[in-house]
Amino acid sequence: MNSTMIDLHMHSFLSDGVLTPSELARRCDAMGFTAIAITDHVDSSNIETVVPQIVKACNEINKHWKIKTIPGFEITHTPIEIIGELAKEGRALGAKIAVLHGETVVEPVIKGTNHAGVLADIDILVHPGVIDEEDAKIAAEKNIYLEISGRKGHSFTNGHVAKTAQKTGAQLIFNTDSHSPND
């Protein structure tokens, strides 16, 4: 049986991960992944430096290795009023995948972040916590995926996310939210 393993939510040392982008890609390639996205945390303070570094690293990896490495970013703990602007800026800087740090129950994420995210130009609402049906419906209409998270803590609400997606027609994606080799 042929299977394809991808992960579109992973972190390098460009934010709070511990591996370089190259080592992250190499380890994933050795484990049989066919594609990964490097989606380091950004806000208005670092988006202009982090995204171009991810793009450069992914371009070099893709020239030499079989694993497809996709440059991305994760908008994290920002004022909800600038989520849309940051999504546009990250894409303009060359990122191919935009994810938003959703309202996980294990961090003090600003209420309304999920809603602002599904109104913005993002691809995945990661660890969306106790997402409501209205936001899940908007995600479904805009082809924004809701994440089922493999990360400790964020995974507490996976059942709710799955049921809400099933009820509203939103698409799901499983990601690890990896920050280290043990993730």
Model-identified regions with their sequence ranges:
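Histidine-centered catalytic micro-motifs
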Residues: 5-15, 38-41, 128
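Short acidic/histidine-rich active-site segments
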Residues: 41, 170-183
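Metal-centered catalytic cores of metalloenzymes
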Residues: 1-5, 14-34, 46-49, 55-65, ...
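Short hydrophobic alpha-helical runs that function as membrane-insertion/retention elements
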Residues: 36-38, 126, 147-148, 172-176
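Extended substrate/RNA-proximal surfaces in nucleic-acid metabolism proteins
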Residues: 47-147
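Short, charged, surface-exposed secondary-structure boundary motifs
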Residues: 108-110, 134-136, 155-160, 183
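Catalytic metal-binding/acid-base residues of hydrolase active sites
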Residues: 11, 42, 74-76, 103, ...
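Residue-level marker for buried hydrophobic side chains located in beta-strands
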Residues: 4-6, 37, 71, 174
